[in-house]
Amino acid sequence: MAVQKNKPTRSKRGMRRSHDALTTALLSVDKTSGENHLRHHITTDGYYRGRKVINR
């Protein structure tokens, strides 16, 4: 098993963790129903880009 020779510095630790930040979900408002939904996904009513695509 590999064992480190020296303790990594706070700077190196921070550089390694720089890509670990969480991002918020991008929400859009539907043109027809005014409902919030994820980008490139249909709403719960079945609308996508203002058109009815699924009968629910």
From Swiss-Prot:
Residues 1-21 are annotated as: Disordered. GO terms for molecular function: structural constituent of ribosome. Residues 7-16 have a biased composition (Basic residues). One of its GO terms (cellular component) is large ribosomal subunit. It holds the Pfam family Ribosomal_L32p. InterPro entries: Ribosomal_bL32 (IPR002677), Ribosomal_bL32_bact (IPR044957), Ribosomal_zn-bd (IPR011332). Keywords: Ribonucleoprotein, Ribosomal protein. One of its GO terms (biological process) is translation. Belongs to the bacterial ribosomal protein bL32 family. HAMAP family: Ribosomal_bL32. This is Large ribosomal subunit protein bL32.
